[in-house]
């Protein structure tokens, strides 16, 4: 006793398993006036190599993105990978080797704004004052989102041109925004 001269030996079949990386953003705070527009992961699939007894337990691979502050701009974060059983229990590997321990996740954070809609009149007669035109828009303003630098440059949302050379009374036009 006191002198243990034994070795544990594990016999198993070594396999490879490839899993898609799922991104979760449950632990992020997005600042007021901003939205998380999209997430992109640098590596979409991860390959594991190890004993089948360990790999058989794994159902999902997750990159759980965390950030300590409020997000107001796009950012890329190195995010550790976590593996779960089909029942949601985290799997800790003893013998399995990971192709990657973490992945880079890019979070596209966009600023939101409500902007007045603006139409442009083209082919008007010379010295024509388009402020004298009476017209109605189905929407006076629209909510938009985009990179903060672009949104901050906008004071109105241009939705298209109305060609006065082809204009007729009671005409209804559509502009896709």
Task: Identify the role of each PLM range.
Residues 1-174:
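Structured interface patches
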């Amino acid at each position: 006793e006191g002198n243990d001269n034994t070795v544990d030996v594990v016999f198993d079949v070594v396999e490879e398993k490839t899993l898609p990386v799922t991104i979760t953003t449950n632990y992020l705070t997005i600042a007021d006036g901003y939205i998380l527009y999209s997430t992109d992961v640098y590596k979409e699939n991860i390959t594991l190599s190890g004993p089948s007894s360990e790999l058989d337990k794994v159902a999902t691979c997750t990159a759980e993105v965390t950030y300590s502050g409020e997000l107001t701009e796009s950012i890329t974060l190195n995010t550790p990978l976590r593996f779960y059983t089909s029942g949601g229990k985290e799997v800790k590997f003893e013998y399995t080797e990971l192709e990657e321990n973490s992945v880079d996740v890019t979070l596209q954070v966009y600023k939101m704004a409500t902007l007045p809609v603006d139409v442009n009149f083209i082919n008007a007669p010379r010295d024509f004052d388009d402020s004298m035109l009476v017209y109605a828009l189905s929407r006076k303003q629209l909510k938009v989102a985009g990179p903060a630098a672009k949104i901050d440059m906008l004071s109105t949302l241009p939705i298209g041109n109305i060609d006065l050379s082809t204009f007729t009374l009671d005409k209804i036009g559509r502009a896709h925004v």
